[in-house]
């Protein structure tokens, strides 16, 4: 009869996960540790961190970005992909979204242009840069190229979604990668609600994205050389 006895198991997804609550918890725990230098190092090395974690079977890891060390759930190792992730657990993907929002908060909460310039010169988005998009396109658009920003569609004005839509339309991305964004809330609105109530806002966001100067031609030789140091080679 033992083969007919069943027990509940932990969910393998983040059902009930509230990104806003997760972000606030993250900020409270890391308020005294976060700085632009550490965030810069994270974004320039996130892809390398994922690759390194994919070779390590440990369920948890403690990568260090500059002087900032953080515990993450390692869901990149093939055998760990179905492990449960708690609401306040951190993954590289969640960290990417949280840190992008943290940078935007720092930018918007400070009216000092010298501070804006410091942020623009310190934080580099390799994904945006490789598409010819820079800070001059606006902080929300520039930061929305970071993975994880789809968790905050309202904060980033739908750009994480509409950047994805544009890339799919141009054959630059498989439609399946839109799934994460299409499951997210917009503020308090569930996906089925904002898909019907926010059509005009999404259309405006998409228009902004389509008007960007897409393409690798927007990069200077200096920028291309810099990105090569981090494994991004452009023609």
From Swiss-Prot:
Q: Among the record's GO biological process terms, what is one? A: symbiont-mediated suppression of host gene expression
Identify the keywords attached in UniProt to this record, alphabetized: Capsid protein, Eukaryotic host gene expression shutoff by virus, Eukaryotic host translation shutoff by virus, Helical capsid protein, Host gene expression shutoff by virus, Host-virus interaction, Ribonucleoprotein, RNA-binding, Viral nucleoprotein, Virion
Enumerate the residues binding RNA: 18, 47, 50, 75-76, 81, 94, 124, 126, 129, 167, 177, 183-185
Could you tell me where this protein is found in the cell?
Virion
Keyword Isomerase recorded: no
- Which Pfam families is this protein grouped with? Bunya_nucleocap
> Assembly state and interactors?
Homotetramer. Binds the viral genomic RNA. Interacts with host PABP1.
Name the family the entry cites: Belongs to the orthobunyavirus nucleocapsid protein family.
Q: Regarding domains, what does the record say?
A: The N-terminus and C-terminus are involved in homooligomerization and play an essential role in viral RNA synthesis.
Q: What is this protein called?
A: Nucleoprotein
């Amino acid at each position: 009869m033992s083969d007919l006895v069943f027990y509940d198991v932990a969910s393998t997804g983040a059902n009930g996960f509230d990104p806003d609550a997760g972000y606030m918890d993250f900020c409270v725990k890391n308020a005294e540790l976060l700085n632009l230098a550490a965030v810069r190092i994270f974004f320039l090395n996130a892809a390398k961190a994922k690759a390194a974690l994919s070779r390590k079977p440990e369920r948890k890891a403690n990568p260090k970005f500059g002087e900032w060390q953080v515990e993450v759930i390692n869901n990149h190792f093939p055998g760990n992909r179905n492990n449960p992730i708690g609401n306040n657990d951190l993954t590289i993907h969640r960290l990417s979204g949280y840190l992008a929002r943290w940078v935007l908060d720092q930018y918007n909460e400070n009216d000092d242009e010298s501070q804006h310039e410091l942020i623009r010169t310190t934080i580099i988005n390799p994904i945006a840069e490789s598409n010819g998009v820079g800070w001059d396109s606006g902080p929300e658009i520039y930061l929305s190229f970071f993975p994880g920003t789809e968790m905050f569609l309202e904060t980033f004005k739908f750009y994480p979604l509409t950047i994805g839509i544009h890339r799919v339309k141009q054959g630059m991305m498989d439609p399946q990668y839109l799934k994460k964004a299409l499951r997210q809330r917009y503020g308090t609105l569930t996906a089925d609600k904002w898909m019907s109530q926010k059509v005009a806002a999404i259309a405006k966001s998409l228009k902004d994205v389509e008007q960007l100067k897409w393409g690798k031609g927007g990069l200077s030789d200096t920028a291309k050389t810099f990105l090569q140091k981090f494994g991004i080679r452009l023609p």
